Amino acid sequence: MRSQSLNFVASNTTSDFISNLLESNVINIIILISLLIYLGKRTIVTNLNDRKLNIQCSILEAEKKLSQAQLRLAEAEKKITESEEIISILKHEAKIAANKIKELIVNNAKRKIDKIILDGKTIIANTEIEIMNQIKNRIISTAIDKTKIKLTKNLQAETIERITDNKITFLNNNL
C-alpha cells in the first residue's frame, strides 16, 4: 500500500506540478497578452488616431470638393438657363426679322410688278398713238394721192398745188 500511496502521491504531485505548470503558463500568457495590449495599445491607439485623422481629412476634402462641384453645377445650370433664354429671344427676333424681310421682299416685288405693268401700259399706249399716227398719215397720203389723181385729170397744175397745200395745212391743223 505504501507503493500505491507513493504512486498516488507521485501521480498527485505530477498532476499538481502539471497543473501548476499549466496555471503558470496561463498566467504567463495572460501577462504577455496584457503587456502586449498595454504596450501595443499606445501604438494601436496612435495608428487608429492617425487613421481617424486621415479619414476625417479625406471626408472634409471630399465634402469640400462636393460643395465646389455643387457650386459649379449650380453655375452651369444657371448658364444653361440663361443660354436657353437667350436662344429663345434670338429665335423670336429671327422670326420677326424674317417676317419683316419677307414683307419687304413682297412689297418690293409688288412695286416692281406695278412698275412693269405701268411701263407696259405706257409702251402700249405710245405704240397705239404711233400706229394711229402712221395709219392717219397713210390715210392722208392715200387721200392726197387720190385727190391728186382726180385733180390732175380735171385741174391745172397751179390750182392743184394750191388745193394740195390747203388740204395739207388743214390736215396738219386737225391732227
From Swiss-Prot:
Oligomeric form and interacting partners: F-type ATPases have 2 components, F(1) - the catalytic core - and F(0) - the membrane proton channel. F(1) has five subunits: alpha(3), beta(3), gamma(1), delta(1), epsilon(1). F(0) has four main subunits: a(1), b(1), b'(1) and c(10-14). The alpha and beta chains form an alternating ring which encloses part of the gamma chain. F(1) is attached to F(0) by a central stalk formed by the gamma and epsilon chains, while a peripheral stalk is formed by the delta, b and b' chains.
Domain of life, source organism: Eukaryota
Keyword field: ATP synthesis, ATP-binding, CF(0), Chloroplast, Hydrogen ion transport, Ion transport, Membrane, Nucleotide-binding, Plastid, Thylakoid, Transmembrane, Transmembrane helix, Transport
GO annotations of cellular component type: chloroplast thylakoid membrane; proton-transporting ATP synthase complex
Membrane topology note: Single-pass membrane protein
Major subcellular site: plastid
Residue stretches spanning the membrane: 21-40
Note: In plastids the F-type ATPase is also known as CF(1)CF(0).
Keyword Membrane assigned: yes
HAMAP family membership: ATP_synth_b_bprime
Signal peptide bounds: none
GO MF entry, a single one: proton-transporting ATP synthase activity, rotational mechanism
Protein name (database record): ATP synthase subunit b, chloroplastic
Protein localization: Plastid, Chloroplast thylakoid membrane
Family according to the record: Belongs to the ATPase B chain family.
Known role: F(1)F(0) ATP synthase produces ATP from ADP in the presence of a proton or sodium gradient. F-type ATPases consist of two structural domains, F(1) containing the extramembraneous catalytic core and F(0) containing the membrane proton channel, linked together by a central stalk and a peripheral stalk. During catalysis, ATP synthesis in the catalytic domain of F(1) is coupled via a rotary mechanism of the central stalk subunits to proton translocation. Component of the F(0) channel, it forms part of the peripheral stalk, linking F(1) to F(0).
CDD domains: ATP-synt_Fo_b
